[in-house]
UniProtKB/Swiss-Prot annotation:
Enzyme Commission number, as recorded: 2.7.4.9
Entry protein name: Thymidylate kinase
Pathway(s) per entry: Pyrimidine metabolism; dTTP biosynthesis
Gene behind the chain: TMPK
NCBIfam families for the chain: DTMP_kinase
Keyword field contains ATP-binding: yes
Binding site for ATP: R17, G19, K20, T21, T22, R98
A Gene Ontology term for the protein's cellular component: nucleus
Lineage, opening ranks: Eukaryota, Metazoa, Ecdysozoa, Arthropoda, Hexapoda
Alphabetized InterPro entries for the sequence: P-loop_NTPase, Thymidylate_kin-like_dom, Thymidylate_kin_CS, Thymidylate_kinase
Swiss-Prot/TrEMBL catalytic activity: dTMP + ATP = dTDP + ADP; dUMP + ATP = dUDP + ADP
A single MF term (Gene Ontology): dTMP kinase activity
Amino acid sequence: MSAGKRGALIIFEGCDRSGKTTQSRLLVELLKSKGIPTLPMNFPERSSSIGQVINSYLTNSKDLPDEVIHLMFSANRWEHINQVKEKLLEGTTLVVDRYSFSGVAYSAAKGLDFDWCYAPERGLIKPDAVFYLRAPPNDLTHRGQYGKERYEKVEFQGRVAEVFNRICSKEGSYFHQFDARQSVEDLHAQIASITEELLPKVATRPLDTLS
């Protein structure tokens, strides 16, 4: 497995508590163990001034109109675009827990227009692969700390899953769907296999943008 001339942008997406954080951590550990320069990231990135407002919203200590928080989530990704581009071109693979697709899915699930939600994401760097972990929201409620944050409600997560399905159809071949109910080990093995094939393919491929 080799990172080649540039790194890959790999995204983990899915409903809350679907296993994204665990699987992204395992993939980072695997790639690093093979000597591949790899950096974990997650969105929202809560340490910036924008990220701190988002964190206050998610932890229910601040209320904002749906349109405003959607644009803040997008701005949080935009404020890191130069870092993302720089790392990829250096040859570092980025493994990212949530990206633009979560922003669209969660806001559209609240009733905002799908195309309006997508608009501010256009121009961000297009992922080389998205690993979408699917599971019925009812099957995720037993997982640790479910319900602690604003969006962790089964009915709402069901609507989020419906929008994710629409996004998968729209974005096509670089979306890889997995049953999140399988064992951590089996899921990791499948993701590792796809990643092993992916890295040399994208090494000389120019960066693309979401459109």
